[in-house]
């Protein structure tokens, strides 16, 4: 659930 958070922050 870390990569997902990074992707959302990248948005």
From Swiss-Prot:
Thermal profile of function: Retains >80% activity after 15 minutes at 100 degrees Celsius.
Protein name: Antimicrobial protein BL-A60
Post-translational modification comment from the UniProt entry: Contains a choline moiety at the N-terminus and a tenuazonic acid moiety at the C-terminus.
Function summary: Has antibacterial activity against P.solanaceum (MIC=10 uM), X.vesicolor (MIC=100 uM) and B.subtilis (MIC=5 uM). Has antifungal activity against P.capsici (MIC=15 uM), B.cinerea (MIC=25 uM), V.dahliae (MIC=200 uM) and F.omysporum (MIC=50 uM). In P.capsici, inhibits mycelial growth (EC(50)=7.89 ug/ml), formation of sporangia (EC(50)=0.6 ug/ml) and cytospore germination (EC(50)=21.96 ug/ml).
Keywords: Antibiotic, Antimicrobial, Fungicide
Gene Ontology biological process: defense response to fungus; defense response to Gram-negative bacterium; defense response to Gram-positive bacterium; killing of cells of another organism
Activity-pH dependence: Active between pH 3 and 11.
